[in-house]
Amino acid sequence: MPNVSDIISSFLQSEIARGSLPGAQYLVGEDLRIIAEDALGLAVVEPEHIPATLDTIYDLASLTKPLVTALLVVRFAERGVLDLNAPLARYLVEFNDKDKREITLIQLMTHSSGLPNWRPLYLEAQTRADVPAAIARTLLEPQPPHGQREVIYSDLNYVLLGFVLERVTGERLDRLAEREIFEPLGLERTMFSPPELLREIAATEHGQEFELANAIADAETRSWGDTASFAASPYRRAVVSQAKWRKDVIWGEVHDGNANFMGGVAGHAGLFSTAREAFRMANQFLPGSELLKPESLHLFTGNLTPGCRTSRSIAWILAETPDCSAGPALPPTALGHNGFTGTSIWMDPHKRRVFVLLTNRVHPRVGAIDMREIRRRFNALAVETVSGF
């Protein structure tokens, strides 16, 4: 009889052979039980070959948003320290200005604040402490006239939520996460800013070529209006020659440029972990959570953006959203999140199923692969695996 992991492992091995990813680590669980797990391929291709194992630590990228930041915000709301419906300006005085004064915490958490999806904050702020003010200077995206803000997935929303947590507690986000999440759950391989564990960590991109291209495109669009004017400008030379750009393989530090600028600790990215420990954290959003009150769980499982093209709860996207990475095998009520480095978590709250896929698909360079289709296929095989267990 074949091992229950075989169909998923065979699929991922085929993607590794095709060059879609260097390696992967995954876990399929139900009711807190691990049904299937495996590690395949390489965690590091450059500067040497290091195999992926079940203990390999991955850069989770945007999975930081739900697993740390959103969880902490709701925990502090349960204690009365934060009000999810309060304006952001109550906690960050930088936002006590006309066009952003009405933005609320819940709008940040559901990506309905109107903030743009990304900005190279390391080019606009001098220090970590300057980041909220730099975001406050950012123009909001155009919104429909009917009054309800459209969903625009934005790193900036969760960068700000990280600063909200730090302002109200007086502690840095990584220390909050350690005390409030990692220690209570007994997590030993989950952290921000990994210590000297280099050979146990999956590498990511060789330099920041992808982000440099995005920064140039962002500056073109915002500052100049046409490519020719920007190409001849001193600002372009300043962007391209920035000493802050990393040139070598990013290994043992966060891939995201904004999070790296903030010392590896940010509300939108910076978390490192394994599939087993990510599974442990993901279960905190399901019935039986050790960290959240039962009455808070609906905030993570219900659609809080009705009428919008994207259905979102706090932090998570719902599978009812057309063309998301859930795929047709998951029910519309499933919730999930992706990370740019090649990570994802999808959950079926009614069956208490959790599917974790961790890859470093950006290593050694960001390629033109269909990561959405890989995630959808993984989810389908995970459903098949757990249903036949």
Question: Language-model features: where?
Answer:
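Short, conserved catalytic-motif segment at the N-terminal edge
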Residues: 2-60, 81-83, 368, 372
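Active-site SXXK
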Residues: 6-13, 32, 59-85, 161-166, ...
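Short, P/G- and charge-enriched loop/turn segments at secondary-structure junctions
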Residues: 13-15, 57, 147-148, 330-335, ...
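Short loop/turn microsegments at loop-to-beta-strand junctions
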Residues: 22-24, 341-344
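Short, glycine/proline-biased beta-turn/loop segments that scaffold the active-site neighborhood
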Residues: 83-98, 183-185
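Short, surface-exposed loop or secondary-structure junction motifs
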Residues: 98-332
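Short, well-ordered beta-strand elements
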Residues: 345-346, 352-360, 365
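Generic C-terminus detector
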Residues: 362-389
